[in-house]
Amino acid sequence: MKYSNVVVAGGGVLGSQIAFQAAYCGFNVTIWLRSEGSIGRTQPKIDHLKQTYIEAIEKMAEDKNAWCAGLADEDTFDKEECLKKVENAYANLKLELDMAKAVADADLVIESMAENEKDKIAFYEKLSPLLPEKTVIVTNSSTLLPSMFAKYTGRPDKYLSLHFANSIWKNNTAEIMTQAQTDEKYFNEVMQFANDIRMIGLPVRKEKSGYLLNSMQECLILKALILHGLEEQVHLKALSRYLIQ
């Protein structure tokens, strides 16, 4: 199934970026938020992203070294068309407090909430009875594994991870990680969605906290500490256990 309606749960730094990028790429996007206070914190992020995208496109038109692959391909770049897509994304992106209303016709729900296990479980338990049969759920969690939450979604076969890097309009990678009950069909659909929002989809077939990129980064940090002779200051053995767990 090709997705049209996307709901992002959470309007933090990455949640707002994911929502704006999907809207920029033509999807109908709603950000579900828990309170009026959340709207007050999220709207300025959306305002800032609009300006960031405009500035990035202007720089791309002047300097190929400033290219943002999440915004356009070099061989088909049209500055005015890209700027129009930014305006459309900003105008059409919706913020919603009513969860039932937000997900009523959702093809994909992207959970991008704080890394708190209890809060995520409560969210999934509230979400589950409200979803249409068609809806696929993904989590953007960077440290908590999808298998921890699959049973609370009510649709473990349609649940997996979709993890983004910060500044996704230029760092355009998306790591797609399954858990034991994920159906291959929905893995493929989410891979396609990642491509549709101009991400490079990186399949992760085994659950791993940190996914691919963070795991690689952690190893590099560890080696750098060794090279700089900082073993004693950072208690290297303890750090090693933490990084590779």
Regions found by a protein language model. Give the residues of each.
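NAD(P)+-binding Rossmann beta1-loop-alpha1 motif at the extreme N-terminus of oxidoreductases
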Residues: 1-68, 130, 179
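Substrate-binding/catalytic subdomain of NAD(P)-dependent oxidoreductase enzymes
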Residues: 177, 203-245
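Rossmann-fold dinucleotide-binding core
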Residues: 136-215
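Rossmann-like NAD(P)-binding element
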Residues: 34, 40-41, 52-136, 144
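Structural signal for hydrophobic packing residues in well-ordered secondary-structure cores
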Residues: 43-57, 110, 131, 153, ...
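Short amphipathic alpha-helical segments
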Residues: 19-20, 43-44, 121-123, 149-151
